[in-house]
Amino acid sequence: DWSSDVCSSDLTNIQFISPDAHPQVIAISSALPNEGKTTSAINLALSLTQAGAKVLLIEADLRRPKIPIYLEMSSFSQGLSNLISGPKKLTAASVNKVLHNYENTGLKVLLSGEVPPNPSELLSSKRFEELIEILRKQYDYVLIDCPPLLPVSDTAIISTKTDGCILVVHAGSTKKPHFVGSRDAISAVGSVILGVIINKIPMNSLEYEYGYRYGYPRYYGANYRPYARRKLEENQYAPNSDVLSRQALDDAFVHIKGQRFKEELKRKESK
């Protein structure tokens, strides 16, 4: 479907960010709740699976898990929290026991498990790192649906164990200070933002200059300017000056690209 096609294109773009290797373990988050991070994570996971990749989707929002609701999966007692907090040594076999197949799609899902009293402590533990390393050896992509960035520190913690983070932005709703705060939270822990998905743009405004009609338009510095994005530039979806604009995204990406350039320069100088 259209959302899967565009999400597949998003991951293709992200794959070319690094000249050495494609991002394999990817955190997906947003500034605040209800901005579309979980549906974006699911669509990305399904599109990659349909393209032939071996994909695992992890529900890491241990406070308000939504994946079982969206995928209409039964709630299972065993999941991520149990693996991290359990006393037994983590192995590929023990991890595989708590994974679930999503229908006949080929997508594997690791649900959140029992709600723990200390999510941040679990996610910052050595066992979570060990789990990620086990999964790296088994899957082409591990997509992690994370909590929103601003209310809790969980996603910043998770992002340090990944190859980077995708931020999901709610068009015409996400505030500039919230986006910048999310960006800074990721940068502060030494992680990187791989890309931004602009989500929830009205379907009747998806009119591209090249004649393509897609859902979920997104900003990756592409050479097209959809009608909806022109409206964002004109602030027609932004009655308040606080609402995230095209210029705010441009400024954010200048900052992110400059940071990556400095990191790459340091890496080359250390060789």
Task: Identify the function of each model-found stretch.
Residues 1-271:
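P-loop NTP-binding module
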